[in-house]
């Protein structure tokens, strides 16, 4: 490998722990999810790296370094030899914990500035795909978390309701809607309990499928009276943390238009 004087540098935050993120660099099935069918990686020093892009374009590489949950380094080049042959550039992926989950730092070193510049958009796109693929796995159970949120609002026993919210939400969870300005589990649970005292028997339920992108979930809902009549509908936006618990929720009710 010759001199690599030109660097492409990019950092992104992923809604997952470093251990989870690193699996997508060590498991070929996960590797192929964000690179494409047929792609594979052998996550040990000297292991082979294969990326199969659309149109049959193949990238080949060799793993140079592996530090579990922290760092992986591999060579990168095109099987055809153009624009760069195998072994002629180097990719370093570093992971570190952050508030969102994991900060991924990519450094791709090239022998020529023009080749580096040609890869800027490719990595911008590929890391965007990566963030979504990882979060799809992390938040695969988001529907049960959201359903648990709606169900907790109907629990009249204080201790049971506290436990239900604690199971699905962070201690410092925030909730905002037209009738709520709440911070923390205790505030949230007390507010939900009060809603049952003033509107006994009212229940919330999810309507339809969730929509999800990188830890942000949209859920439509319906509020029903004790006799089963539908009273109101709306949409909640949930922000989930790297452990798939609710960090914040914002509710939008479909209120009648003012006359």
Model-derived segments and spans:
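Short acidic-aromatic low-complexity motifs
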Residues: 15-19, 141-168
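Residue-level recognition of conserved beta-strand positions in structured domain cores
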Residues: 53, 76, 106-108, 177, ...
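A beta-strand edge to alpha-helix "cap/lid" segment located at domain peripheries
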Residues: 81-133, 195-259
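A solvent-exposed, acidic/Ser-Thr-rich amphipathic alpha-helical stretch
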Residues: 18, 37-52, 59-61, 67, ...
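Short, highly charged C-terminal tails/helix-capping segments
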Residues: 132-141
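Hydrophobic pocket/interface hotspot
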Residues: 21, 31, 49, 63, ...
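Hydrophobic ligand-binding cavity/cleft-lining segments
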Residues: 1-40, 142, 148
